[in-house]
Regions:
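Conserved short beta-strand elements that form part of the metal-binding/catalytic scaffold
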Residues: 28-62, 108-115
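Short secondary-structure junctions
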Residues: 26-34, 85-90
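Conserved active-site alpha-helix within GNAT-family acetyltransferase domains
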Residues: 16-25, 99
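Intrinsically disordered, low-complexity acidic/polar segments
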Residues: 17, 74-76, 110, 120
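Vicinal oxygen chelate
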Residues: 5-13, 41-43, 55-124, ...
Length: 124
């Protein structure tokens, strides 16, 4: 299991309004922009901007991450061997595959394995 990248989640009211500020802070355009369920997301540097209806914010705040890994299945095997529990997934998304795991300390973490195209686009 290799961690390739982590993001700080930031909840914003409007992605189109917030995105230019974070692109300016980072000094680069967004690496990714996509919809997921009721949310619209953009990855800029090490920030993951999330815009969603107020009623859905708590659902997205309940987990930490995403933690981008090289191999989701291997990561799940390693984590469950240390008493982590899969609480959701693995699922397929626009960027690859993901799963939610609860660590023995109670932390709920989202793990993502990017598709080869997304990995190449973001990491080079």
């Amino acid at each position: 299991m290799q961690i390739l990248k982590t993001y700080a989640r930031l909840f914003v009211d409007d992605l189109d309004t917030a995105l230019p500020l974070y692109e300016s802070i980072v000094g680069a355009p967004a690496d990714l922009r996509f919809g997921f369920e009721q949310a619209e997301l953009a990855a800029v540097g090490d920030f993951l901007l999330i815009a969603c209806p107020p009623d859905d914010v708590d659902r997205y705040r309940s987990t930490v991450g995403p933690v981008i890994v090289d191999d989701l299945d291997r990561s799940i095997a390693r984590l469950t061997a240390t008493a982590a529990v899969v609480t959701g997934g693995p699922f397929t998304s626009a960027t690859g595959r993901f799963a939610y795991l609860r660590h023995p300390d109670g932390a709920d973490v989202e793990y993502v394995e990017w598709s080869p195209a997304v990995r190449a686009r973001v990491l080079g």
